[in-house]
């Protein structure tokens, strides 16, 4: 029960940091643009929803490994990630180019 509260709090923390990035930073939404930013070495952090198709997920992780970029696996599905970004559509993956006022890159635990 305590672990559930901690997960909920960390999810809220990531959601708040994502909202701050959406207001003050630069980002791209979507699979094709995430791959483009990874190939051009512009991305600083990639966030992937947990229901992203496995082939897409592995391809994004491969390009992120080549570009030495941290990948964070979001604990919600693509609808939850879209809502956390403040959008009214589904977001499977997003790339943060400039975090702006947010410290999401320093505090987000990433898996590569």
Curated annotation (Swiss-Prot):
Keyword Ribosomal protein (UniProt): yes
Pfam families the record matches: Ribosomal_L7Ae
Organism: Zea mays (Maize)
Single Gene Ontology MF annotation: structural constituent of ribosome
Transmembrane segments annotated in the record for this chain: none
Cellular component, GO, one term: cytosolic large ribosomal subunit
PROSITE patterns in the cross-refs: RIBOSOMAL_L30E_1, RIBOSOMAL_L30E_2
Protein family: Belongs to the eukaryotic ribosomal protein eL30 family.
NCBIfam families: PRK01018.1
Protein name, as recorded: Large ribosomal subunit protein eL30
Tagged with keyword Ribosomal protein: yes
Domain of life: Eukaryota
Keyword vocabulary terms for this entry: Ribonucleoprotein, Ribosomal protein
Classification via PANTHER family: RIBOSOMAL PROTEIN L30 (PTHR11449)
């Amino acid at each position: 029960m305590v672990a559930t509260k901690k997960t909920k709090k960390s999810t809220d923390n990531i959601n708040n940091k994502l909202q701050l990035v959406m207001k003050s930073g630069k980002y791209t939404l979507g699979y094709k643009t995430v791959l483009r930013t990874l190939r051009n070495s512009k991305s600083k952090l990639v966030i992937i929803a947990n229901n992203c198709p496995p082939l897409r997920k592995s391809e994004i992780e491969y390009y992120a490994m080549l570009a030495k970029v941290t990948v964070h696996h979001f604990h919600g599905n693509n609808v939850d990630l879209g809502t956390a970004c403040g959008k009214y559509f589904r977001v499977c993956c997003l790339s943060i180019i400039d975090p702006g006022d947010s410290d999401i890159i320093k505090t987000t635990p990433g898996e590569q």
